[in-house]
From Swiss-Prot:
It comes from Oryza sativa subsp. indica. One of its GO terms (molecular function) is DNA binding. This is Squamosa promoter-binding-like protein 10. The SBP-type zinc finger is required for the binding to DNA. Trans-acting factor that binds specifically to the consensus nucleotide sequence 5'-TNCGTACAA-3'. InterPro entries: SBP-like, SBP_dom, SBP_sf. Pfam families: SBP. Residues 268-290, 392-426 are annotated as: Disordered. One of its GO terms (cellular component) is nucleus. Residues 268-287, 401-417 have a biased composition (Low complexity). Expressed in stems, leaf sheaths, and young panicles. Zn(2+) 1 binds at C181, C186, C203, H206. It is found in: Nucleus.
């Protein structure tokens, strides 16, 4: 009976307790290793139980467990030793998976390139969502169509341009040649020269040389144009071409001419008032000087007269008219020139009026001087021929104007009364 049950169990499964384990992937860590150990232990127990059953008729725990599985005890919970492995038999956890094995869900197409400093995307030839939609490159939103054949060439161009822009004269500027002199046979390196010489590609020696062989011709470097010209465009040993030198001289002379014109205009403006207010001629000055001398001599002759003497001075009318005719014409500043017919008459009248005022002042001064000497009365009769514009033309020969000037002088208790009579003849 016992043997039949064991045979039935062995026909179904070599491990009768295998079905008792809960199904599910990864239920136990290191399941394969633990299963092999359990199988070996079960086989040894089965052989020991069979020996005990046939020879000693003792109780077999493994056989009881099998009976409970296939008998009426299928609803009982499994034994705890069958669910958990001993700690010594537990396998270590598996190592973490390497990064290359973690592939993304969307694989990049073979046409996609991600260089160090730029990204280039191309239209993929394969199917798929990316191929159908098409990718947009970094070319300002435009589609980039590159075949796999020109991939390396495009990468070189991009890397060269980007490296040259980022590092300056580093990677990109490695192929840049330094500036050299353009004169034949010179080819001097201008890397350490001045900026002017580097810019125009000429060394300092050939920039100042009178004759330079450049481009197969005898030329000279122009300082104004900053380039080479043939020798026929220069004047003798000049370092500037004829055209630019003429322009330079014209620019320099233009301010000088303007300054000269301004100075001449200023001189003319200053000379205009001087010409308008210049002194009278020599004849007029001599005439005025002679008249003043005559007045002074007359006053000197009258000064020693005593207080009791009466003096009458009468000048011939003809002589006065002749002297008036001989006197020059007096001009007034800012006045309009007189007419030719009335010019001598108006000038003579103005001069006579001025002379009359001077005579009157001289006589008055003499009277005051004589009056201060002693007591008595001084009577002076002055006869002069005066032509005045203020007098009427209908005057006769003997218009007499009496002017009585009473001057009271308190000098030593004496009163001096002076009576001045002026007789004007027309």
């Amino acid at each position: 009976m016992m043997s039949g049950r064991m045979n039935a169990a062995g026909d179904e499964s070599p491990f009768p307790f295998g079905a008792m384990q809960a199904p599910g992937p990864g239920a136990y860590v290191g399941f394969d290793h633990g299963a092999a150990a359990v199988a070996a232990a079960a086989a040894a127990a089965q052989r020991a139980g069979m020996l005990q059953h046939h020879h000693h008729h003792m109780y077999d725990g493994l056989d009881f467990a099998a009976a409970m599985q296939f008998g009426g005890g299928q609803d009982a919970p499994p034994h705890p030793q069958l669910l958990a492995l001993p700690p010594s038999m537990a396998a270590p956890p598996p190592p973490p998976m390497p990064m290359p094995l973690q592939m993304p869900m969307t694989m990049p197409m073979p046409g996609d390139v991600y260089p160090a400093l730029g990204i280039v995307k191309r239209e993929g030839g394969g199917g798929g969502q990316d191929a159908a939609a098409g990718r947009i490159g970094l070319n300002l939103g435009r589609r980039t169509y590159f075949s796999p054949g020109d991939m390396l060439a495009v990468d070189r161009l991009l890397m060269r341009s980007r490296l040259g822009g980022v590092f300056g004269l580093g990677f990109g500027g490695a192929h840049h040649q330094p500036p050299r002199c353009q004169a034949e046979g010179c080819k001097a390196d201008l890397s350490g020269a001045k900026h002017y010489h580097r810019r125009h590609k000429v060394c300092e020696y050939h920039a100042k040389a009178s004759v330079v062989a450049a481009s197969g011709k005898q030329q000279r470097f122009c300082q104004q144009c900053s380039r080479f010209h043939v020798l026929t465009e220069f004047d003798e040993a000049k370092r500037s071409c004829r055209k630019r030198l003429a322009e330079h001289n014209r620019r320099r002379r233009k301010p000088a001419a303007a300054a000269t014109t301004a100075v001449a205009a200023a001189k003319d403006a200053a000379a205009a008032p001087v010409a308008a207010g210049k002194k009278p001629s020599g004849g007029a000055a001599t005439s005025y000087t002679g008249d003043n001398k005559n007045v002074v001599s007359m006053s000197a002759a009258k000064s020693p007269i005593s207080s009791n003497t009466s003096v009458i001075s009468c000048l011939p009318e003809q002589g006065k008219h002749a002297a008036a005719a001989a006197r020059p014409t007096a001009l007034t500043l800012g006045g309009a020139p007189p007419h030719e017919s009335s010019a001598p008459q108006i000038g003579a009248m103005l001069h006579h009026h001025h002379h009359h005022q001077q005579d009157h002042m001289q006589v008055s001064s003499l009277v005051h001087i004589n009056g201060g000497g002693g007591g008595g009365s001084n009577n002076i009769l002055s006869c002069s021929s005066v032509c005045s514009s203020a007098l009427p033309s209908t005057a006769t020969n003997g218009e007499v104007s009496d002017q009585n000037n009473d001057n009271s002088h308190n000098n030593g208790g004496n009163n001096n009364n002076m009576h001045l009579f002026e007789v004007d003849f027309m």
